[in-house]
Amino acid sequence: MNNTEYYDRLGVSKDASQDDIKKAYRKMSKKYHPDINKEAGAEQKYKDVQEAYETLSDSQKRAAYDQYGAAGAQGGFGGGAGGFGGFDGGGFGGFEDIFSSFFGGGGSRNPNAPRQGDDLQYRVNLSFEEAVFGVEKEVSYNREATCGTCLGSGAKPGTAPVTCRKCHGSGVMTIDTQTPLGMMRRQVTCDICHGSGKEIKEPCQTCHGTGHEKQAHKVSVKIPAGVETGQQIRLQGQGEAGFNGGPYGDLFVILNVLPSKQFERNGSTIYYNLDISFTQAALGDTVEIPTVHGDVEMAIPAGTQTGKTFRLKGKGAPKLRGGGQGDQHVTVNIVTPTKLNDAQREALQAFAEASGEKMLHPKKKGFFDKVKDALEDI
């Protein structure tokens, strides 16, 4: 066996994350589940998937498999040709549990213990204003829910799961394997009950024995004022159904704030760029400034320079932690006109002369320049 076969069984790459491996396992396990897939060879493929996941879901076993292949994942003690073969631990009480702990067997694990369901993620887009003021949104998504027919037991109504005849309820089987390193003992998921410790004789017709069914689900999310992109809201119990009566997982709502055409924001501070003319900058003016709270008047002092920033107190976003309101910063940009009419040009020349500025006289416009200006004015 090469060092990628387990990855191939799950349909993932060798650098797949644990989340990717878990998702692939659930997909392939459901695809080849003997209660669902009646095709020839499906049961063997199901066992192969179980074996692959047993190794790749354990970081230590996975590392050994990547380096040494299946033999490395099944054992780790170097030892003579005999290894531990033929030694059943008789008279040593806890030896089996100790041995299992080395190989990830989990001897004390109760397969029938309630387990919480998987968490889910949902991305929500917010407008700039919704992020500033807060909003309540309803989100819709599909999730694995407790089967409404069998109420999660996986068994046909009127019947009940029974203790697995092969593993006797432990959910695992102990296997001795001859490897290049010697005889190694390992624990694998029971291929009859698939780790549950229970055997379903008559599967539920709705969920086919899984205890779960895919359902559309809606939930209302209250998004507080002042949130930013990347922040998450956790909704407890809105994830996927648990196992053996365990609770539902959680839903994590990930926020994405869409950009504004007018404003930028960092935390509780909102930024706005204001274009003014050089006469407004020189003489001063009072202008209307848009804010998320409505338009406000702002005075521009005479002699204002490009890059000057003014602060509008309390016109920013709410502070998510600690309370209070942020400010809006207004940065001035003086716009130089690209086209002047004769009156404007003469006025500026007069201003330059009055200021004592020494300027080279601009080139007088010829006939074709005047025609060009006339065409641009049309």
Swiss-Prot record:
Its main location: cytoplasm. Keywords: Chaperone, Cytoplasm, DNA replication, Metal-binding, Repeat, Stress response, Zinc, Zinc-finger. CXXCXGXG motif repeats lie at residues 147-154, 164-171, 190-197, 204-211. Its cofactor is Zn(2+). Binds 2 Zn(2+) ions per monomer. Belongs to the DnaJ family. This is Chaperone protein DnaJ. It comes from Streptococcus pyogenes serotype M1.
